[in-house]
Each structure stands twice: as structure tokens, then as C-alpha cells.
């Protein structure tokens, strides 16, 4: 039987030699003598040889070829079974049986010696396509295939008959021989190239052991790729008896395993089949979180799909083109997680190694850009991110000089001389002040006030009754001249009103009549989304749902892997499986960051415990509760309002006033008709921590003399609404201004008693207010006195606190706070003494100080006192002197002051009835 195999092999070699005149093969005999193929006698089917051996693979340095040779030898029987005809259907169904495989492969040459060599001068044979690669005529290419066929000689009829006899007598397990293109078209018309589009390369093996003109070939079983259709019956059998491994691999989008060629490896320049390339391109897509502030619709980001090989320049150009024409700009660049520097344009998305927590920001460098929709001919105005309002007003005047009725505002010569003579003090650190006058005092000079003002339209709903003329009056926030624009949370699509100043009492609604409407085209604050409106319960649900999805996906993947392992025990080698799985794992880490398996069960248990803790958490007793308002499901344990829209929940009535960072409005709760006060604050990077601290302190306070906190609402990206008690009268300072009168001694005593009660409660909680003054003492319609404004309050973790910057109002600061020395709750006692002088005389002492240099001298000055002490009782004078002790150690506490005779003799709040009625009537008439 072995002699028959050798004769068939020799016959195949003779057929190749007869069709290739330039091909000469040397055969090594048993005597170690090389015999040329031209000297060999013609062999027929009865010729028997047993001296031909297979080549030695040890000289091949290509590791991939060695692995593939081993795979082919191990799976030799299975590969041959896939090419059987209809006559061997039973054998194909039992392709895992080694006995049947050996019986079906009787004609396979297995007794060839390992020293067979061939010499091919300047040629290379590719059996998958039947093309001679190094031919000058590009044999095997689609364009020159017909030309190559004519250049080859047709085989004689005798050889054709021999081939037909061989094909009819041999078993189907014998693989077709390597044929030239001309012979292949005659004998095997069904044999076609596995991939005609594969380019043909002229490269040669680069192994140092391979001579340039005599490349070594390995002679394995002459098998073609599975893509070659040998006959119709073979194709049907292959489809019916296809291995389950290939089906599972296709379902997992893994690259199809390709068998190695019989003589040489497929060229590295050849492409994969179309199905494999399409699957790889699908895996190459990446889902990315993109922040587009110009398209903000309530979500912090959008998910877009891009190719992993796309450069950041291409992605930014694509996103920029999808914006509306007004927001398209060549300045837009990509920033990873809102970093300061943009992403280099040459990097690809795969190079960034994005995770599910990363967000790409499409923005430009920090700056402000303004446009006028009604006057597009004016173009746009670009300003620095740290510009102040007064400088901004001057720029806008010059920008709009063509459409203004008069020339830009210019200062007089006397005012310019005064400005030059007045020194400007440089403040190294950021100082927090609560009023415009305090800011001017600390800046070291009185700046020139412009005749124009700038208003910011707030996102507060207005009713139809407020429509006056062409423009809605709405609700606007005045921007103070000495404040930087970054303090007001100006963002993209905000509306500003540029108009002349109108003198008023500061209590009426600012309207936009006669002003020019300006739209913010770009703002750096739009790049800073906050998570204040994110619900913890919602986040836990999303995390739990994601973990459940991941577990389901992992279970499905494990089931598929088990099926694959059961079906692929005899079909896939260990090397190929390891390589494919490693590639897929690396791809999943980069392209599918959301599908991450979490094996840490303790983490899941912590999340569940935290969720149960949140649900079972009761309202702390230290939180100010709205006792006379009905709360429904739209208020959570953190007092965050959600559910219905703000417009449907509250009805805005009027603007009560404003400060340096926000405004206060009176609203009605529609369901209960209960009045509330909403403080609208602009969220900025420098104010986020202060606002969060203020809310945290409000939630911890439950006292009749402390302003109650009803919750917070995140209406938009850079605005936060704080719900508080509505004090219809307003502050003591507003009441004195409206009534044009100060308080008498009885009224001061009752106010002091209630303030001490509130301060005593705060100090018991470790909270230092640090900004006690008449403007922060509020009165309700029922004559209840409450302490408000915790914007600069501090909760001391130790006995003493340290102030590194000036905190509070400068004229009310305690000496230790001015000197930036350690302080404690007794700093509020000093501020209370200054407030009592303000209530008695209408203004605080040391009002004539004009600079910080003079203010620093307060600790060295004698304690302040009343201007006319004789007009007041000795008890009141003694109480003031007790509060205004410069040494904090000698200064009394709240408990000590409550035992003073001035407080013991205090009456009820009915002594304030006349002032309260006068104030309410004046407010209603406005």
C-alpha cells in the first residue's frame, strides 16, 4: 500500500514537471545520490517508490508555520473528511472516529522521507490560487489570467487520460494536486481561487537558512482551503457536516481559523475574507460620552458612536459640523474630562484607552463671546474669562457705539484726577464680602460708576400678566460693577440686558424696558456640569441594573464557551484558542468598558446595605421642617425636590431683593397656597463648596429663631434654588429703610433676645455664623425673628477655627478675624454688639474707614460705642461694652449675656407691631 502512495506522488511530480519546462526537481535516493527529475523514467500508476521522504521542518524559522504544520498533522484526518463525496456520507458524519478516518485516507502519501528538496529558480508556487507568484506576467491576477493561460502548454492527451483514470480510481480523501493555471482549467474546472481579490506579492522567504534561489518547501498533505469548492456534492456535505466550532466562532464574531497552505504560508499582505473584515470593523466601533453644551437638553452628556481608529481631529470636526451654524467654530477642540489642555489631534480614540467614566468635552479655550441677535452686523465681542463687570461695560459701550443714541461714556477730568490720586490696593487672596459697599471698601478706592448697568435674565417662570410692551419684564439679576463676571454663572444661551441705570429703592422688579438684549454665544462655565441634581437612589438603581446585565451577559458567555469547548475538543489547537481569546479580551477592555464583570461580592453587598440605609433613614431632629406644608413623594430625605416641573409646583410672585450672588423671590406652593422664599444662586466653580456648606448647615438647624430650610431644586445647569421660610417683612435693615426710622431700646432688647436664642442654638451645634448684622436678621408677618444667610458660616471641628481669608462683612468683623487669628463662637458676640449700634443709630460704627489699611487698625483702636451714650440707658451701654471686648477670652458667651439685666427686662415682639404694619403696607403699594 505504501508503494501505491509513492507511485501516486511520483506521478503528481511528473505531471508538474511536464507542464513546467523551467521547473527541475532533484530527488534523493537511498544511496544519498541526487537524481534530476529529467533523468527519471516515466512512471505509470503501477510504479512503486518508497524512497521519497517529506521535508525536514526543523530548518524553518517561522514559528507560525511550525505551529500550523503541527496543527495540520494533528487534525489531518478531520481535514480530509471535509472533502469527501456523496459516497462517503456515513464517514463524514463520523468524522471524529479515528478508525474511519484511517480507512478513508489510504491514498495519502505518508511514507515520504524527510530529505526531499526542490529547487525553483526565481519562482514561488501558491497552491491556494494555483498561481506562480514571481512571474513577470503576474500569473494568477484577475486581469492577466487569460494571458497566462495562453503562455502555458496544453498537456498531451495521454496525460489527460492518465489524470482521469487517477481521479476515478483514487479515493475522495486525496487532495487535488498542485496544478498550473493552464492545466487546472482543463482538468478541474471547478477549482477556483479561494479569494480572487487577494493581491499577489513578490516577496520571498527571509529566513537566513533559505538560499535566495532555492527556497525550501514543506510537503504536507496537499489540501486546499475550505473555501474551494471541489464539487457540488462536496459543498453540500461540508455544509451539512460543518463543525459546531465554526458556528460558535461566527456567533462570537471571532476571526475564522484558516488552514495553512500545503507548501507555503499565505502572504502577510493578503486580506481576510469579507465576513471577517466586516465583523472586525463592527468590533472597532466605540461608544463615547460627549459633552456638547450647545445642545444641552437636561442630560450631562450624549453617547455617540465612532470608529476606534478615528483621530481626535476627525471626531472634533464631525461633532463641530453637527452643531447649529451659530455655534460652529474652528476654536472648538476636544478635552478629555474637561482638562486644561486639549487632546492632541494625532491621537486616535483607541490611544486614549477610554473607560465608561470618561467624557469628551467639545469646547474651546476659556473665554466669553457675546452677540446681539437683533443687530448681526455688530459681529461678536470676545472677552477674557476673568473680566470684571465695570470693564465689561466699557467694552460693550465701544462695541455698541454705532447703535447707541449717544457716544460712549467718558469720565470727567476731575474724576480721572481723583482716580489717579487714590491708590489701588492689591489683594493677594480672594475675599468674600456680602455687599457691594463692603467690596468697594476692601478694594481700596471708590471706582467710577458707569451710567450703564448689566442685567442677567434668571430662569424663573413668569406669568402672562407680566408682559409689558414688546419685552417681558421677567426677573433679572443686577450685576455689580466690582464683581467679576465669573461670579454670576453666565453660561451659553443666557440673556443679558444692557441698559441705562434707573434709580430706585432696590425693592422693585428690574425690567428690560429700553435695554439691548445680548445673547451669550460661549461661556467657560458651560463646561462645568454639576452633579447636584443627581439622585442617589437613581444612581444605585442604575448601578444595580448594570451589574445584573453584566451578570446575565457573563452567564451567556460562559454557556457559549462551554458549548464551544465541548464541540471543539478535536478541532481547535491550544495555541490558536489562546491567541484568539487574548485578543478578544483586550478588545473588550478597550471597546466595551461598560461590560465589566465585578466579582467582588462585598462591593455589591455594600451597595445594597447603603440602599437599605437610605430607605430606612429617618429625618434628623436637627433639620428644619416645614411643619405647615404638605410634602408628597417629590421631596426625598435629602430635601431635594423632584417629580413635577418647577413651574407647576410654585407660582412666583415678586422679587424681594438680591445680593452679590443671587436674588430672593416670594413664591406660593400651588397645592397648599403656602408662601415660601426661593433663593436663586448662580453655581460657579468658586461658589459650589460655599453653597453646599450653606445647605448642609441649614439642614442641621431646627430652631424657631433660625431660618428653616425646605429643600433645594436644581432648575438648570448653573442655578440652584434654595427653599426657605418666607419672611414677609424682610430684614431689620429693610424695615428701617422703608420706615425711615431706627429702633428704640425696647425694640432693640426684644430683637437681641431672639438673636441670642438663635446664636445659642447654632453655637451648641458648633456653628459660627460670622456674619451677624441687621441685613441678616429677618422678620415674618407673625413678628418672628430669624437668623438667616449661612453663606459664610463655619462649623468648627475643634474648639477654635482659623480664617485664612477675610470672611464676612468687614465693618462687623471681630478683631481676631481681622487679624486672621484663631477664632471661636465668641466672634459672633462682637458682631452682635456692632449690630446693636446699627439698630440704634442706623449705621455701624467706623463707617468713615475707606481702605483696608485703616480697617486693620480696628484691633488697635478703643472699642466702639454709641455716638451719644447719654441718650440711652446705662444698662444698654453696659450691655454694649460687655459685647465689644477685644480680647476673645474676656468676651462673654451667649449664656452669660442671657443673664444680663438688659435681656431679662426684654418684652415680647408686640413692640414691633407698628413697624411691621408700616413695612407691609409699603411693600403692597409698590
UniProtKB/Swiss-Prot annotation:
Region (Disordered), start-end ranges: 36-257, 546-576
Protein EC: 2.7.11.1
Catalytic reaction(s) noted: L-seryl-[protein] + ATP = O-phospho-L-seryl-[protein] + ADP + H(+); L-threonyl-[protein] + ATP = O-phospho-L-threonyl-[protein] + ADP + H(+)
Keywords associated with the record: ATP-binding, Coiled coil, Kinase, Magnesium, Metal-binding, Nucleotide-binding, Serine/threonine-protein kinase, Transferase
Cofactor: Mg(2+)
CDD domains: STKc_MST1_2
Domain Protein kinase, residue spans: 650-903
UniProt: ATP binding residues: 656-664, 679
One Gene Ontology CC term in the entry: cytoplasm
Comp. bias intervals (Low complexity): 56-107, 134-173, 215-253
Top-rank lineage group of the source organism: Eukaryota
Protein family (similarity comment): Belongs to the protein kinase superfamily. STE Ser/Thr protein kinase family. STE20 subfamily.
This protein's name: Serine/threonine-protein kinase pakE
Source organism: Dictyostelium discoideum
Amino acid at each position: 500500500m505504501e508503494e501505491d502512495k509513492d507511485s501516486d506522488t511520483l506521478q503528481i511530480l511528473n505531471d508538474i514537471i511536464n507542464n513546467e519546462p523551467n521547473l527541475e526537481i532533484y530527488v534523493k535516493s537511498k544511496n544519498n545520490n541526487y537524481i534530476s527529475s529529467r533523468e527519471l523514467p516515466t512512471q505509470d500508476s503501477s510504479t512503486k517508490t518508497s524512497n521519497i521522504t517529506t521535508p525536514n521542518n526543523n530548518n524553518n524559522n517561522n514559528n507560525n508555520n511550525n505551529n500550523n504544520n503541527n496543527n495540520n498533522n494533528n487534525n489531518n484526518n478531520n481535514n480530509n473528511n471535509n472533502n469527501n463525496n456523496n459516497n462517503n456520507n456515513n464517514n463524514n458524519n463520523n468524522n471524529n472516529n479515528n478508525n474511519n478516518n484511517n480507512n478513508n485516507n489510504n491514498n495519502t502519501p505518508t511514507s515520504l522521507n524527510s530529505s526531499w528538496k526542490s529547487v525553483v529558480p526565481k519562482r514561488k508556487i501558491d497552491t491556494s490560487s494555483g498561481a506562480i507568484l514571481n512571474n513577470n506576467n503576474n500569473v494568477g491576477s484577475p486581469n492577466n489570467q487569460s494571458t497566462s493561460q495562453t503562455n502555458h502548454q496544453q498537456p498531451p492527451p495521454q496525460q489527460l487520460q492518465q489524470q482521469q483514470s487517477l481521479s476515478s480510481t483514487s479515493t475522495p480523501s486525496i487532495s487535488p494536486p498542485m496544478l498550473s493555471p493552464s492545466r487546472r482549467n482543463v482538468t478541474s474546472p471547478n477549482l477556483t481561487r479561494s479569494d480572487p481579490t487577494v493581491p499577489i506579492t513578490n516577496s520571498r522567504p527571509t529566513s537566513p537558512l533559505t538560499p535566495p534561489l532555492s527556497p525550501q518547501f514543506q510537503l504536507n498533505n496537499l489540501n486546499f482551503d475550505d473555501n474551494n469548492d471541489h464539487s457540488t456534492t462536496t459543498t453540500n456535505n461540508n455544509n451539512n457536516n460543518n463543525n459546531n466550532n465554526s458556528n460558535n466562532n461566527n456567533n462570537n464574531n471571532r476571526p475564522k481559523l484558516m488552514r495553512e497552505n500545503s507548501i507555503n504560508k499565505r502572504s502577510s499582505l493578503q486580506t481576510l475574507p469579507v465576513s471577517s473584515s466586516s465583523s472586525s470593523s463592527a468590533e472597532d466601533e466605540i461608544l463615547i460620552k460627549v459633552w456638547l453644551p450647545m445642545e444641552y437638553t437636561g442630560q450631562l452628556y450624549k453617547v455617540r458612536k465612532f470608529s476606534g481608529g478615528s483621530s481626535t481631529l476627525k471626531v472634533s470636526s464631525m461633532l463641530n459640523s453637527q452643531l447649529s451654524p451659530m455655534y460652529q467654530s474652528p476654536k472648538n477642540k476636544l478635552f478629555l474630562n474637561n482638562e486644561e489642555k486639549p487632546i492632541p489631534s494625532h491621537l486616535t480614540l483607541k490611544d486614549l484607552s477610554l473607560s465608561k467614566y470618561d467624557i469628551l468635552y467639545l469646547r474651546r479655550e476659556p473665554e466669553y463671546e457675546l452677540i446681539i441677535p437683533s443687530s448681526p452686523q455688530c459681529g461678536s465681542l470676545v472677552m477674557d474669562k476673568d473680566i470684571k463687570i465695570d470693564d465689561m461695560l466699557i467694552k460693550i459701550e465701544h462695541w455698541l457705539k454705532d447703535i447707541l443714541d449717544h457716544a460712549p461714556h467718558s469720565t470727567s477730568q476731575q474724576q480721572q484726577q481723583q482716580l489717579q490720586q487714590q491708590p489701588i490696593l492689591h489683594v493677594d487672596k480672594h475675599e468674600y464680602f456680602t455687599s457691594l459697599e463692603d467690596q468697594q471698601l476692601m478694594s481700596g478706592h471708590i471706582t467710577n460708576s458707569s451710567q450703564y448697568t448689566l442685567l442677567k435674565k434668571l430662569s424663573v417662570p413668569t406669568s402672562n400678566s407680566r408682559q409689558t410692551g414688546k419685552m417681558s419684564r421677567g426677573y433679572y439679576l443686577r450685576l455689580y460693577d466690582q464683581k467679576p463676571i465669573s461670579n454670576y454663572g453666565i453660561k451659553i444661551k443666557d440673556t443679558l440686558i444692557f441698559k441705562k441705570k434707573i434709580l430706585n429703592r432696590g425693592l422693585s422688579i428690574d425690567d428690560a424696558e429700553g435695554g439691548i438684549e445680548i445673547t451669550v454665544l460661549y461661556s467657560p462655565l458651560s463646561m462645568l456640569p454639576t452633579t447636584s441634581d443627581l439622585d442617589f437612589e437613581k444612581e444605585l438603581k442604575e448601578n444595580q441594573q448594570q451589574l445584573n446585565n453584566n451578570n446575565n451577559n457573563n452567564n451567556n458567555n460562559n454557556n457559549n464557551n462551554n458549548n464551544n469547548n465541548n464541540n471543539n475538543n478535536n478541532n481547535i489547537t491550544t495555541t490558536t484558542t489562546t491567541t484568539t481569546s487574548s485578543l478578544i479580551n483586550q478588545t473588550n477592555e478597550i471597546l466595551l468598558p461598560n461590560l465589566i464583570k465585578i466579582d467582588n461580592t462585598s462591593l455589591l453587598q455594600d451597595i445594597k446595605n447603603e440602599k437599605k440605609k437610605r430607605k430606612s433613614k429617618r429625618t434628623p431632629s436637627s433639620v428644619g421642617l416645614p411643619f405647615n406644608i404638605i410634602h408628597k413623594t417629590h421631596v426625598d430625605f435629602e430635601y431635594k425636590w423632584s417629580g413635577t416641573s418647577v413651574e407647576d409646583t410654585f407660582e412666583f410672585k415678586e422679587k424681594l431683593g438680591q445680593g452679590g450672588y443671587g436674588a430672593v423671590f416670594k413664591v406660593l406652593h400651588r397645592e397648599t397656597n403656602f408662601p415660601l422664599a426661593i433663593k436663586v444662586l448662580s453655581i460657579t466653580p468658586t461658589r459650589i463648596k460655599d453653597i453646599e456648606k450653606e445647605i448642609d448647615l441649614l439642614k442641621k438647624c431646627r430652631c424657631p429663631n433660625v431660618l428653616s430650610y425646605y429643600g433645594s431644586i436644581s432648575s438648570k445647569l448653573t442655578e440652584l434654588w434654595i427653599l426657605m421660610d418666607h419672611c414677609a417683612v424682610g430684614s431689620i435693615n429693610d424695615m428701617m429703610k422703608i420706615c425711615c426710622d431706627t429702633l428704640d431700646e425696647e425694640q432693640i432688647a426684644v430683637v437681641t433676645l431672639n438673636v441670642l436664642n438663635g446664636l445659642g442654638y447654632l453655637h451648641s451645634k458648633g456653628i459660627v455664623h460670622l456674619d451677624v448684622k441687621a441685613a441678616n436678621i429677618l422678620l415674618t408677618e407673625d413678628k418672628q425673628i430669624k437668623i438667616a444667610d449661612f453663606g459664610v458660616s463655619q462649623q468648627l471641628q475643634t474648639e477654635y477655627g482659623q480664617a485664612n481669608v477675610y470672611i464676612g462683612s468687614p465693618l462687623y468683623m471681630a478683631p481676631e478675624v481681622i487679624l486672621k487669628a484663631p477664632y471661636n463662637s465668641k466672634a459672633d458676640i462682637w458682631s452682635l454688639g456692632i449690630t446693636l449700634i446699627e439698630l440704634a443709630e442706623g449705621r455701624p460704627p467706623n463707617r468713615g474707614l475707606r481702605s483696608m489699611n485703616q480697617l486693620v487698625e480696628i484691633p488697635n483702636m478703643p472699642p466702639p460705642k454709641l455716638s451719644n451714650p447719654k441718650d440711652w440707658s446705662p444698662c444698654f451701654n453696659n450691655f454694649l461694652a460687655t459685647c465689644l471686648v477685644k480680647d476673645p477670652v474676656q468676651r462673654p458667651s451667649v449664656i452669660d449675656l442671657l443673664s444680663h439685666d438688659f435681656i431679662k427686662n426684654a418684652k415680647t415682639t408686640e413692640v414691633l407691631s407698628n413697624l411691621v404694619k408700616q413695612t407691609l403696607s409699603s411693600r403692597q403699594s409698590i
